[in-house]
């Protein structure tokens, strides 16, 4: 596993350090930040969004707080005013609203700077931004669009739908409101092969919104609020649920990420990926 950082808007130099548990990774990352000029995007007095994923309550799979604390210290040393931020989830979970999101952040150890839910109490704070590609526009979370600079901290991992999730997905899904998330997910469709469906209702039981309907021992997904997440598809015991136009999700992620980037002036975003 590696940690790397890059500065700039879309594609500039990328710097790597080895993920070696026998080394002091804070000292190693210090040298990386200097080489990459990670914090050169910050000017004195800037309100700096520190975009991260605080993890689910009780789940340890997130960037550890001591790495984030180090980044917060570097931002303050550069004259910035950092705030931790992430957008509320579309699905019903512990991070579905700002109150529970903040509680989760605190319980998981993210208390070194104020935490602001990027899209407001119930995802009502957003801005429509023009973009390019498969999406003509995207709903960007208000606190992201209003920040002066941003450090994007991403935990890179595999993903059922997009294949891989890193900085682009962190921008695209993590910096957009619920409406923006739905815009991206709805570029794909779900299809149920009725010859394989047994009506077992596993899809309904695992769906965060309990959306699939079981009619005459067959499942149907017709709700307009279905966000085309991969949960039901991955849990179906007979593999009856399939995605159509699955390649569109990566195109939508790229469009949304570009829309987020364009709310900032040039060279006001840096990225640190784990």
PLM-predicted stretches and their roles:
Residues 1-2, 210:
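Low-complexity, intrinsically disordered short segments enriched for Gly/Pro and polybasic residues
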Residues 2-11:
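Short, Lys/Arg-enriched N-terminal segments with co-localized hydrophobic residues
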Residues 13-44, 49-52, 57-59, 63-66, ...:
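Extended, low-polarity segments enriched in aliphatic/aromatic residues
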Residues 66-74:
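Short secondary-structure subsegments characteristic of cysteine-rich extracellular domains
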């Amino acid at each position: 596993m590696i940690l790397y950082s890059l500065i700039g808007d879309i594609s500039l130099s990328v710097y790597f350090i080895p993920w070696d548990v026998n080394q002091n990774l804070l000292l190693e990352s210090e040298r990386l930040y200097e080489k990459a000029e990670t914090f050169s995007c910050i000017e004195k007095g800037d309100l700096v969004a520190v975009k991260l994923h605080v993890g689910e309550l009780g789940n340890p799979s997130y960037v550890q707080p001591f790495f984030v604390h180090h980044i917060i210290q570097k931002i303050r040393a550069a004259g910035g005013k950092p705030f931790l931020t992430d957008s509320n989830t579309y699905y019903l979970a512990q991070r579905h609203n700002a109150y529970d999101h903040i509680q989760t952040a605190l319980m998981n150890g993210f208390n070194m700077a104020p935490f602001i839910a990027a899209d407001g109490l119930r995802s009502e704070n957003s801005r429509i931004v023009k973009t390019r590609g498969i999406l003509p526009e995207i709903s960007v979370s208000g606190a992201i669009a209003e920040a002066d600079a941003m450090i994007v901290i991403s935990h890179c991992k595999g993903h059922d739908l997009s294949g891989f999730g890193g900085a682009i997905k962190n921008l695209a899904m993590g910096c957009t409101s619920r409406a923006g998330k739905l815009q991206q997910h709805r570029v794909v469709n779900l299809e149920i092969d009725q010859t394989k469906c047994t009506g077992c209702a596993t899809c309904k039981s695992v769906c965060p919104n309990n959306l699939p309907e079981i009619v005459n021992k067959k499942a149907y997904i017709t709700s307009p609020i279905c966000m085309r997440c991969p949960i039901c598809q991955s849990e179906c015991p007979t593999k009856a649920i399939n995605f159509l136009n699955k390649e569109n999700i990566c195109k939508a992620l790229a469009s949304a990420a570009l829309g987020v980037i364009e709310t900032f002036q040039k060279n006001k975003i840096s990225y640190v990926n784990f």
